[in-house]
């Protein structure tokens, strides 16, 4: 990375997003893994005012610590949200994961607003931080350890961000796990594996009340979001087969919990159910949950893993490759394949590179993001590259332009940008967008007929604080400025896609995705100057 250019971009962005702030300097803990030393620095308090205290702040810190030879991982703490910023191994662009967890509250309790991790350990180990001391723990027992084994190793030591063997073996879609959840897509596990870092353990005072309330809220939000997504046709059903199989409709959160009343283990999120289920010809929720739990324990992103298996099955049907005898319904074979991916064993060694690499190797590049005119990823339309969207909104709008409501049908691009800004803004302010942004779960109840100023409508109709949208725009500008230096931003998307027939819509709708995306980029190019909407 050209660090001279990066510093200039950061300076320009800081000037363009200037906002007076009375925030005093914030304490940041820096862990140098190479020397196994720790230091505490005072970071710029003005960044707090421009970019918020969590996500935006972490992105700005990443830019400050990045050099030509250093890819830092930055963890910023809020009391309810934790943001982790890193460089995607597939695209080399800066991306992030956010999660509701007491991890951030623990870090705050130790007196720090953020943790910056640089360098790499000599062998597998962990960073342990508590209110008294900071140290690195090295142990060969952690090498190729599963997430459950890592958590057991550090039991009673505090909140643990852990990786599995997929991170040790350089799988591009390796993920990290925290508080019983995958932190997100984008290859965080891979980046931690590069640093030989199996875990980050934080412990402060007892905050069980915070942890319990977070878990209860997450459960309620997931249930509501899943139900609304299926009802309104936001979620894909079987995207490798034009997403039309109605059987997946019955695997909503409520129905799945009823079926799994006696099941011991984690319950997969909506996208994981789709990718490890219908895309792999499996409609048994218990089998899907077993696959999800195995992915979690191995530190594999379940959505990307399902995408790889789905591509493999589809490529076999089209005689692009030959995998005689393997079917998605054979759960034993699928479970073995998932384990082979994490350990880079047999065919899993190739599959671990992701479908972008696989399709290119098979001269089948078009299907890496578009099969039969439909994109692969139900959540991330570039999911074949095992990378998250640059936008925080990916977790809340499974497909931006698939929504056909009174709110979005006339001006989908405007409302996409608005919601993206609000998600980025609330994430940066340490709030949960699922709770704060009501359009994400109740769009069908909104009857707005036209769009206007984002500030005006956000404040007047929803009671949103306009500072959230402004902060989100600042963060978007910062992230895309950094990524303009970090790597080449490519938007590989299909020309169109078809909405689910298993929804309230009488007929599948063809959405001109490329045209809408061009409009989106044009609007973003003006950085939210006054939007003129044609009401005709």
Specify the residue positions occupied by each region the protein language model found.
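Conserved mixed alpha/beta core segments that line enzyme active sites in large multi-domain catalysts
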Residues: 47-105, 109-187, 268, 272-290, ...
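Extended C-terminal regions of large enzymes
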Residues: 16-25, 29-32, 38, 42, ...
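Short, Gly/Pro- and small/polar-rich lid/capping loops
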Residues: 2-22
